[in-house]
Amino acid sequence: MTEQTLVLIKPDGVSRGLVGEVLARIERKGLKIAALELKQVSDELAREHYAEHADKPFFGSLIEFITSGPVVAAVLEGPRAIAAFRQLAGGTDPVEKAAPGSIRGDFGLETQYNLVHGSDSPESAKREIGLWFPEFPVA
């Protein structure tokens, strides 16, 4: 079954020149890039995207980080796209939990500055794609 997922290359990935590397890994995995856009994230979009973390102590720094520079947003499609990208990304903590060979394992150093975001469920993917690509047809 074909699935959709939202992927963000966060400001640290963009500023470090890793966009091409991340997109190449996505394509080598066999996922289709159905939509792609470089954008400066508004405070409003950041707060909507990370709404589930609003009551957590790191929320303010998370919003500050994601709005600190351009982000590459993409919609990926493919069989088990959500799990496939999350495997490619590696664990959230790039030093302790991300396997070597994953994006975070190879390039990440800190939990907050972990280069990429990928939707964690079909429900999250639908919500996130609707936020980042309001005109895009969500499956």
From Swiss-Prot:
Is Transcription among the key words of this record?
Answer: no
Instruction: List required co-factors.
Output: Mg(2+)
User: Which cell locations does it reside in?
Assistant: Cytoplasm
Please give the chief subcellular localization of this protein.
Answer: cytoplasm
- Residues annotated as catalytic: H117
UniProt lists the family membership as follows:
Belongs to the NDK family.
Q: Quaternary state and partners of this protein?
A: Homotetramer.
Query: What HAMAP family is this protein classified in?
Result: NDP_kinase
- Swiss-Prot/TrEMBL catalytic activity: a 2'-deoxyribonucleoside 5'-diphosphate + ATP = a 2'-deoxyribonucleoside 5'-triphosphate + ADP; a ribonucleoside 5'-diphosphate + ATP = a ribonucleoside 5'-triphosphate + ADP
**Pfam families attached here?**
NDK
The cross-references to InterPro entries, in alphabetical order and at most eight, read: NDK-like_dom (IPR034907), NDK-like_dom_sf (IPR036850), Nucleoside_diP_kinase (IPR001564), Nucleoside_diP_kinase_AS (IPR023005)
The name this protein carries in UniProt is: Nucleoside diphosphate kinase
Record flagged with keyword rRNA-binding: no
GO MF term (any one): ATP binding
Recorded source organism is Nocardia farcinica (strain IFM 10152)
Share an example GO biological-process annotation for this protein: CTP biosynthetic process
Q: What is its EC number?
A: 2.7.4.6
- Keywords from the named record: ATP-binding, Cytoplasm, Kinase, Magnesium, Metal-binding, Nucleotide metabolism, Nucleotide-binding, Phosphoprotein, Transferase
Q: What does this protein do?
A: Major role in the synthesis of nucleoside triphosphates other than ATP. The ATP gamma phosphate is transferred to the NDP beta phosphate via a ping-pong mechanism, using a phosphorylated active-site intermediate.
UniProt: ATP binding residues: K10, F58, R86, T92, R104, N114
The GO cellular component terms are: cytoplasm
